[in-house]
Amino acid sequence: MTITPQEALQRTIEHREIFHDEMLHLMRLIMRGDMSPVMAAAIITGLRVKKETIGEIAAAATVMREFANHVEVQDNSNFVDIVGTGGDGSHTFNISTASMFIAAAAGAKVAKHGNRGVSSKSGSADVLDALGVNIDLQPDQVAASIAETGMGFMFAPNHHPAMKNIAAVRRELGVRTIFNILGPLTNPAGAPNQLMGVFHPDLVGIQVRVMQRLGAQHVLVVYGKDGMDEVSLGAATLVGELRDGQVHEYEIHPEDFGLQMVSNRTLKVENAEESRTMLLGALDNQPGVAREIVTLNAGTALYAANIAESIADGIQLAREAIASGKARAKVDELVRFTQQFKR
């Protein structure tokens, strides 16, 4: 027996869970454009108020993956996504995008899934565009990019066309909903390993268990206690780690890895051009907070990708990738490769 949107709304008002098959049905209605905007808005707001459960989020992510334009990657080994939910309000330069180049230089394959900035001054798509990367690739071209360069950027609108059916509702509501946390769960290339930053401490335990249900292999979900959706230099970082089917939650500190705890204030940018300058400075091995934070995050990503045995080992590999110039060379390689597909 399928649930009606009205019954689902009543369930959220009563703070009761919507079950897996029911959530699949409701999400398919939304993604097909078969639910009225009023009902869709009411249900996603109701879910937010009652707080979405692990089961509800996992079901919604399953449907988003169903409707996505997939990128077929042949070799899944050392394959990782580095992504944040955004919405942390920190307005820093694109740390996860910089980390992609370093991780690829150290031997990982990275499928980065991102968009233009909504809550930030510069989304991953904005800074890659500023670097000269052609972000508007077809799925087969992204697959070729991953095979050739070890990196592929999937511009969210190209891979999730069904999201247009809820876009106007989300825009008009103007508040966070379940869709803000679904993006990092719906990598179109199906990367089995992930470094995922989240905007709220409660999401650490939730998102890592959603990834567990979705069959991921090695995932680190992180929240910097200074509010960053990255591994932070300015505070301890909460970590939810999924490995070998088991979840462990713990805290890490910059000092654990011989790094100095420093404020992230100097990492703030106003636009994509400033983000580009800071990113290139870090990859050019210019000493400073930007280089240290991308080293820390890339090192964590290399651990998630199973290239490194530990975060500490990953940091060492990241340092070598920057110092050798290999990380900086990856920027030019991605620009060259993607520009051949310019339409």
From Swiss-Prot:
It is an enzyme of class 2 (transferase). The lineage of its organism: Bacteria, Pseudomonadati, Pseudomonadota, Betaproteobacteria, Burkholderiales. Keywords: Amino-acid biosynthesis, Aromatic amino acid biosynthesis, Glycosyltransferase, Magnesium, Metal-binding, Transferase, Tryptophan biosynthesis. GO terms for molecular function: anthranilate phosphoribosyltransferase activity; magnesium ion binding. 5-phospho-alpha-D-ribose 1-diphosphate binds at residues 84, 87-88, 92, 94-97, 112-120, 124. Its cofactor is Mg(2+). Anthranilate 1 binds at residues 84, 115. GO terms for cellular component: cytosol. GO terms for biological process: L-tryptophan biosynthetic process. Binds 2 magnesium ions per monomer. Pathway: Amino-acid biosynthesis; L-tryptophan biosynthesis; L-tryptophan from chorismate: step 2/5. This is Anthranilate phosphoribosyltransferase. It comes from the Bacteria. Its EC number is 2.4.2.18. Catalyzes the transfer of the phosphoribosyl group of 5-phosphorylribose-1-pyrophosphate (PRPP) to anthranilate to yield N-(5'-phosphoribosyl)-anthranilate (PRA). The gene is trpD. The keyword Magnesium applies. Anthranilate 2 binds at residue 170. It catalyses: N-(5-phospho-beta-D-ribosyl)anthranilate + diphosphate = 5-phospho-alpha-D-ribose 1-diphosphate + anthranilate. Mg(2+) 2 binds at residues 229-230. Gene3D superfamilies: Nucleoside phosphorylase/phosphoribosyltransferase catalytic domain, Transferase, Pyrimidine Nucleoside Phosphorylase, Chain C. Homodimer. Signal peptide: none annotated. Mg(2+) 1 binds at residues 96, 230. Belongs to the anthranilate phosphoribosyltransferase family. PANTHER family: ANTHRANILATE PHOSPHORIBOSYLTRANSFERASE (PTHR43285:SF2). InterPro entries: Anthranilate_Pribosyl_Tfrase (IPR005940), Glycosyl_Trfase_fam3 (IPR000312), Glycosyl_Trfase_fam3_N_dom (IPR017459), Glycosyl_Trfase_fam3_N_dom_sf (IPR036320), Nuc_phospho_transferase (IPR035902).
